[in-house]
Amino acid sequence: MTERSVIHDTFVIERTYPASASRVFAAFASREAKDAWGETGDMAEAEPATGPVAFDFRVGGHERFGNVYQGVRFTYDAVYYDIVPDQRLVYSYEMYADGVRLSVSVATIEFVSTDDGSVLTWTEQGAYLDGFDGPDAPQLRQGGTSEMLDGLAKYLA
């Protein structure tokens, strides 16, 4: 029998961008934009996986995609719960590796205009399940999110 466990963690990442809150928000609101900046680091080298892909950016809508990295099929499955244009996104998502659920998270992304652009604050609460990503799972997720936001900075430049 598989040993069951949960690691709970919350992290907050704040980034300042020289782009309006509206422009930063728009980078999350279209599949084409997210595809341009969302895959970074090692995962940028991953192959797209076959299977259902969705990008339904509305409250109750789903975002779903997958890729294959080092022979493992990763799947991301999200549901949007709150969308306030140019101000806030709240969604939950599950991550899978070869069909095994690795984690369930709630992400809140806030966009605030400033004189020089905007500030994005990403708050994520995660439940990392059954030790599949090891004891460093929260740090790995935060690092991956930080890399992704670096990709957003390059996209907005």
What does each model-found stretch correspond to?
Residues 12, 32-73:
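Short beta-edge strand/loop motif at the mouth of beta-sheet-based domains
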Residues 21-22, 81-88, 110-119, 154:
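A short, structured loop/turn motif at beta-sheet edges
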Residues 15, 52-53, 77-82, 105-112:
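Hydrophobic/aromatic beta-strand elements that line small-molecule binding cavities or substrate pockets
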Residues 1-47:
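Hydrophobic ligand-binding cavity/cleft-lining segments
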Residues 96-146:
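Beta-strand/loop substructures that line and gate deep hydrophobic ligand-binding cavities in soluble
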Residues 8-14, 50, 62, 75, ...:
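Intrinsic-disorder/low-complexity, polar/charged segments enriched in Ser/Thr/Lys/Arg/Asp/Glu/Gln
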